[in-house]
Amino acid sequence: MASKCSSERKSRTSLTLNQKLEMIKLSEEGMSKAEIGRRLGLLRQTVSQVVNAKEKFLKEVKSATPMNTRMIRKRNSLIADMEKVLVVWIEDQTSRNIPLSQSLIQNKALTLFNSMKAERGVEAAEEKFEASRGWFMRFKERSHFHNIKAQGEAASADVEAAASYPEALAKIIDEGGYTKQQIFNVDETAFYWKKMPSRTFIAREEKSVPGFKASKDRLTLLLGANAAGDFKLKPMLIYHSENPRALKNYTKSTLPVLYKWNSKARMTAHLFTAWFTEYFKPTVETYCSEKKIPFKILLLIDNAPSHPRALMEIYEEINVIFMPANTTSILQPMDQGVISTFKSYYLRNTFHKALAAMDSDVSDGSGQSKLKTFWKGFTILDAIKNIRDSWEEVKLSTLTGVWKKLIPTLIDDYEGFKTSVEEVSADVVEIAKELELEVEPEDVTELLQSHDKTLTDEELFLMDAQRKWFLEMESTPGEDAVNIVEMTTKDLEYYINLVDKAAAGFERIDSNFERSSTVGKMLSNSIACYREIFHERKSQLMRKASPMSYFRKLPQPPQPSAATTLTSQQPSTSRQDPPPAKRVRLTEGSD
């Protein structure tokens, strides 16, 4: 019996390097530790230990050579480092739906190798690399890039296919009986969430200082809506950190975005499938129910590698249609102005918040020092709030107008959105003047376009270095734990009183009764949920206190003696009322 128990214990705790590698791979694809544990039949603690020490285990893999493995040659470290950067470039290209070919990848590999060799100087002087066909085939196998063509050149946007596709799509819509409310499109976009126009002093200072560059900190957003424009999907945000410091006190499921992560901050097939089954399906089903329309959906997506074809077979009610290759830049609705409009709103909202922060800063510092203080404290949480506000700001006319090329028969009233971006850019320039920043309209255009530009070699090297830095930060002990802020009853009472005092203050200083009264009601209604929590907690406290313990705290009247009984029974000639009993206020123990 003992031997059986020990063997079971061993099977639970003894892991092979292949198992550890599988855990790390699934984690980097965005799967949670609990999900990994369920899939592999392991405890979450075990998964956490491996994932948090991934660098250590990866070194083990490099040094481990199975007995039945024949060592052909030791791989060049410079080539291995180059390939890591090359993978980032390939993923960046495919995420932008830019077709690739063998020759393009070979040329890029050679360029990256020569740049890295020159940077390393004498220590890499003897290193050699030929981007041969044999190397390409081995690299493709190692990196699991099975969809890259081994021959031929990459194709440009297919104008002919784009011209004929709307007719084919119209037939699908007609046969399925889909309305504008039932047709959806989603698309990913790379997003630099903490980036200033290049000519501002903040951008110049960051460029001159070595080390981490906040302006190069990139995330991926998935944005989508229906053709009617009356239903925006909750943005999905993919970051490279599972638990950023700014989010430590927040339950991620309550954020205004669907927060996901992997080490490269990119969409994967696993993440997209999870989004499709866990969020999109139940959300659009609820929407159809509320609108009293049949639950049948047409979802249009591009041919990105992160969009698996298996989605077409999951739900009968959701018809997943892949647009023709190399047509998304011409046809895909989200790419026709929704994403660019959203990004312009994000920039304007960022500048608005900077101005508000400077106005509320009562320190004696200059305008530039106040702006630097604001920008230094601008976190991923602030970015998430900005994403929420900017996505809410995208108008119905923009959401519907971008479908004009794809389904012209369903989109009748079309209002342009380009003027909207131009107006927002003009607003940014005006706010920049108040912030003492050098910003011209072309600077705003350059920044908005930079999100979609292909990464330069310098940016690729920098992103690889920052990725390693974040991996080291994530692997430190204790990062897996998240501390949730406690909302105490005492704090609730304090802040509720502050709001009530503010409402009373406006009424006191404003001679316009209607205005102050309206504001007072709005303030009171806005915190109704917190009042409810507060009163419920007070009620619970009262119920916990027993009736007998309550009365024991009240002053006890003296027991009458026999001598005083007769006297007390005589009517009093005094009109003085007896002193009231002291009331004891119940207080919460430790909150």
UniProtKB/Swiss-Prot annotation:
Biased amino acid composition, Polar residues: 561-576
Domain (HTH psq-type) ranges: 6-57
DNA-binding region in chain numbering: 33-53, 103-142
Gene Ontology molecular function terms on file: DNA binding
InterPro entries xrefs: CenT-Element_Derived (IPR050863), DDE_SF_endonuclease_dom (IPR004875), Homeodomain-like_sf (IPR009057), HTH_CenpB_DNA-bd_dom (IPR006600), HTH_Psq (IPR007889), RNaseH_sf (IPR036397)
Protein location: Nucleus
Domain HTH CENPB-type: 70-149
GO CC annotation, single: nucleus
Keywords from the named record: DNA-binding, Nucleus
Region (Disordered): 550-591
Residue ranges of coiled coil: none
Chain ranges of the DDE-1 domain: 178-403
Predominant location category: nucleus
PANTHER family recorded: TIGGER TRANSPOSABLE ELEMENT-DERIVED PROTEIN 1 (PTHR19303:SF26), TRANSPOSON (PTHR19303)
Protein family (similarity comment): Belongs to the tigger transposable element derived protein family.
Name this protein carries in UniProt: Tigger transposable element-derived protein 1
Organism from which the protein derives: Homo sapiens (Human)
Lineage: Eukaryota, Metazoa, Chordata, Craniata, Vertebrata
Gene this protein is translated from: TIGD1
